Amino acid sequence: VARHAGGSWAAKEAFIKAWSCALFGHPPFIGGDEVDWREIEVIHDEWNRPAIALHGRVAAACEESLGPSSSWKVLVSISHDGACAIAQVAIVDATA
């Protein structure tokens, strides 16, 4: 359980960093201390592949800053090694 929670938390943090990088040169839409982490949900499909589901203010701010959610896609990778977890997130153009 702790291993799963660590990977999910790492993915949420990585999402915030990827979103910030996508807005390079512009101020963040939500300050780091204002993020409601419950609005960033790590989900898995039936093959246990991770994805990010956004809710509430975070979802609205992403659409405002990045455009309609149909125009971008969040790619997630989570890895574990013993007690350590790491995640990578990329926000890419879904229309390309």
Feature annotation, model-predicted:
Residues 1-96:
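Core catalytic alpha/beta fold that binds nucleotide/phospho-ligands
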